[in-house]
Amino acid sequence: YDWLSKVTGRTLAWGMLTGVRPTKLAMQKLEAGMSRKEVCTFLEQEYGVSHQKAELGIAIAEREKELLGRLDYEQGFSLYVGIPFCPSICSYCSFSSSPLAEWEDRVDDYLKALCQEIRALGERAEERKLNTIYIGGGTPTTLEAEQLFVLLDTIQKSFSFEDLQEFTIEAGRPDSITREKLEVMRRFPVTRISVNPQTMQQKTLDLVGRKHTVQDVKDIFHAARELGFDNINMDLIAGLPGETAEDMRDTLCQIEELSPDSLTVHALAIKRAAKFGQEQRKIDLHSEIEQMVEESARAAERMGLVPYYLYRQKNIAGNFENVGYAK
């Protein structure tokens, strides 16, 4: 890294770190008794991490340590339930999901098998403590309201919620969320949902294949608030095709007006570069995404949100990171 940096005249914000969770390294050093200043110096000198990113990693490691300390590592466990369907596949996405239209006649079969597995797991985990539940995907709200009820009812009947600390449903795309589905969620102890616009620029939503409008995002968010959801996350992506730092600023202004309880900002992971014609985009986007990331951090601070988790991916645009902010 040092040699390449010298030859090219370039440095990377995360230096030579390539792992998914750079906060793990910071946490290991903190748990070993090093001071915050010592950990920062270590990351900068040993791995070439910039001072700004070292401070970010340490701050998040400290918060993660406090949050993870609430979990029971001996008897506790977390449950993840995956719904591998989406209304359509976004151009930038490489997650394991399929368009609902291709599998619509098999969703009931999938749900039946999934519920059977949940009941079996509930029997095996009877003596353990369920700490957190996360229903993700895909897009969980591609399930119809009746199907969503069956899933949530099966989970509730299969596990004790006595030790449950968080129950998240990644409601996801506004074009799959309805008031009826939100009402179903309210019948169960769901504590957190995620409404994910990715951008508030209509031109970009159309370009990447998301079949909803900016107004749809706002309408669903307000409907969730009216129904009593008091922990709503929103996801954004920095570096979507055709977007500028100015577009990101406008998106963030609209998000601030909604005032979500947490915000997750992803730097675009270019895994399907050929589809976008973006092989060069990883290099070209560095300065633009840097501005977007900085604007996001400032917007989060204005909303009273602090960074609490961080992870990185291979081929991430600009060699940046994904950061979650919460109150």
Regions found by a protein language model. Give the residues of each.
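Short, conserved phosphate-binding/catalytic loop or strand-edge motifs used
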Residues: 18-24, 45, 60-62, 96, ...
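N-terminal [4Fe-4S]-dependent radical SAM core
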Residues: 4-11, 31-79
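Short aromatic/hydrophobic contact patches that present stacked aromatics
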Residues: 27, 78-80, 168, 237
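Conserved non-cysteine loop/helix-boundary elements of the Radical SAM core domain that shape
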Residues: 97-296
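Residues at alpha-helix termini
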Residues: 6-7, 45, 187, 226, ...
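Canonical Radical SAM [4Fe-4S] cluster-binding loop centered on the CxxxCxxC motif
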Residues: 74-109
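Auxiliary Fe-S-binding modules of radical SAM enzymes
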Residues: 1-37, 41, 279-327
